[in-house]
Regions:
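Extracellular/oxidizing-compartment recognition motifs
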Residues: 1-127, 134-135, 151-154, 171-178, ...
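Alpha-solenoid helical-repeat scaffolds
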Residues: 133, 187-190, 207, 251, ...
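Helix-terminus loop motifs that line ligand-binding clefts
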Residues: 14-33, 150-246, 374-395
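A generic structural motif
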Residues: 4, 60-62, 72, 262, ...
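Catalytic cores of carbohydrate-active enzymes
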Residues: 94-96, 110-112, 125-140, 144-147, ...
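Non-catalytic C-terminal accessory modules of carbohydrate-active enzymes
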Residues: 364-513
Length: 513
């Protein structure tokens, strides 16, 4: 006939015979019949010369497109055009280093983030396209260092307020058609209600979202307080898709309970809610003490069984007593060294591990982990051709095998923090005052981190020159900064910097073995 039907199937992997591999989607897809195949466009050609078609009412995540036709067609790559679509968020940050793997990893992380930003943050652009709460807050710092996304998150938190039940419970996908209330929709995922408004406040100095969500955070914390009167809770999904070691869900969920309660107490103080401030400050201390009493061995500096996630999460979120931080971090570094500078974490550990190391005197180990290119690591994906982040550390896994996922995406924010050292100051948020805590790991010779703050561009740039680090800093107008020197350089430990450009020459301490 004159008109033939062609179908385009959009997929992420190929079988050995060159056909598209749909297993990543088929494992979850439950079609009623074959009339509306998933990630597939069906078009009837006119038979009157060249036809043009663009799918305007959906989007797909894919690496390969397979075209099949009822009648023979002559096609080449010029007949198909792919458009990269995502929410319109201006770029705010830039990372460039002397390590090509790090540069490409930063780029791939941003690709994954944008692929998963379609009105709200999603888990993956091909299989579910759902607003998984955990994925959203694991990546929030990466998001805000790289992109001006405040309006996306204001909208998403309005969805949170709409979806919250009267008792305080949130579903673990938002928005939802009703699924996600009776699952493991606990603290390690649905803490978005507190973590995202707090991070918006840190990065923008704007507390409106925190104010809008105050009663919702309170209802959420009160629900957990009622159901977990000891301060310990196992409500959550746990360290999802770990390499091999499993962590205590009670430890990690209780840490997020602490974080939410601490954010609520800080917000209460800010909004002059004196009674709330007293109550939730006391509750936060109770939770912290309960965690340390149950899980911390104060003699050895080990949490739980001492696996990477159990050591990392308490360090990242301020649970570890001040006098034990270095000891706990050293134990974590030993674990990483014993694993050959490889990861043994799931999503909760991936969020915490680099920060836990680099902010507690173990930046060398953090950098070796970030720059690792063999399994299991972030860099292993890149070394094997990935242009986004994956859902599974194992390239040969048979489930949880999306090739475009954001849940392991904290590393993109860590480059600004652990290497560039650009941090907002909780006392003067929105980068009115900037905390500069860069690290100069021996394996890296140059780093440049730029971030467009509300006051102008912050630049933290350093290069290694023989026995010293030359550190260039730009502090924007109407801002100030404090530079904190890392352990491996000589000189003043803290230097206050006014607006303008500064060059600091920092002699490197000789390593003692």
């Amino acid at each position: 006939s004159n008109s033939s039907a062609a179908s385009d199937v959009y997929k992420r992997q190929l079988y050995d015979n060159g056909r598209v591999n749909t297993s990543n989607i088929d494992v979850y897809h439950r079609p009623v019949d074959n009339s509306d195949p998933f990630q597939t466009d069906i078009l009837v050609l006119s038979g009157k010369g060249e036809d043009e078609f663009m799918a305007r009412f959906n989007y797909k995540g894919f690496r390969y497109v397979e075209v099949t036709s009822t009648n023979p067609l002559v096609l080449n790559e010029n007949n198909l055009t792919a458009y990269f679509v995502h929410s319109d968020v201006p770029q705010k940050g830039m990372i460039h280093t002397s390590n090509a793997l790090i540069n490409r990893l930063w780029w791939a992380t941003n690709n994954a983030y944008l692929s998963n930003l379609m009105g709200y943050p999603t888990d993956c652009p091909q299989r579910e396209k759902n607003g998984w709460t955990g994925d959203g807050h694991f990546a929030i710092e990466t998001a805000l260092y790289n992109y001006d996304g405040i309006t996306v998150y204001e909208k998403w938190l309005a969805d949170h307020r709409d979806e919250q039940q009267p008792n305080g419970v949130l579903p673990d996908i938002i928005p939802t058609g009703g699924w996600g209330y009776g699952t493991d929709n606990g603290l390690d995922w649905t803490s978005t209600i507190a973590l995202i408004p707090w991070n918006i406040y840190m990065f923008y100095g704007d507390h409106k979202l925190l104010a809008d969500c105050y009663e919702n955070i309170k209802r959420y914390v009160d629900y957990v307080d009622r159901t977990s009167p000891t301060g310990l809770t196992s409500w959550g999904r746990g360290d999802w898709v770990p390499v091999k070691s499993h962590s205590s869900k009670e430890l990690t969920s209780s840490v997020y309970f602490y974080v939410d309660t601490k954010i609520l107490a800080n917000a209460a103080k800010m909004f002059n809610k004196t009674e709330d401030y007293k109550y939730y400050s006391a509750l936060a201390n109770k939770i912290k003490n309960a965690i340390n009493d149950k899980f911390l061995n104060r003699e050895t500096g080990i949490y739980g069984s001492g696996v990477q996630t159990e050591q990392s999460v308490p360090l990242q979120w301020g649970i570890v007593p001040e006098e034990l931080k270095r000891k706990v971090a050293r134990n974590l570094a030993k674990q990483v060294e014993a694993a050959g500078f490889h990861l043994d974490v799931g999503v909760l550990g991936a969020k915490a591990i680099l920060n836990a190391l680099s902010e507690n005197g173990e930046a060398e180990t953090a950098y070796k982990l970030a720059a690792q290119d063999t399994y299991p690591s972030w860099g292993c994906w890149i070394a094997n051709g990935a242009t986004t982040l994956l859902e599974n550390w194992d390239l040969n896994a048979t489930r949880d095998i999306s090739d475009n996922h954001m849940m392991f995406g904290e590393i993109g924010g860590w480059f600004y923090k652990g290497l560039g050292g650009i941090f907002p100051d909780p006392e003067n948020p929105g980068f009115k005052h900037i905390l500069l805590r860069p690290n100069f790991p021996s394996g890296l010779n140059e780093l440049e981190a730029r971030y467009q703050s509300p006051y102008g561009e912050i630049c933290s740039k350093w290069e290694r020159k023989k026995n010293r680090i030359v550190y260039h800093v730009t502090v924007p107008a109407n801002s100030t900064a404090t530079f904190y020197a890392p352990d491996n350089v000589k000189g003043e430990r803290a230097v206050n910097l006014e607006a303008g450009k500064h060059i600091l020459e920092l002699p490197i301490k000789r390593a003692v073995y």
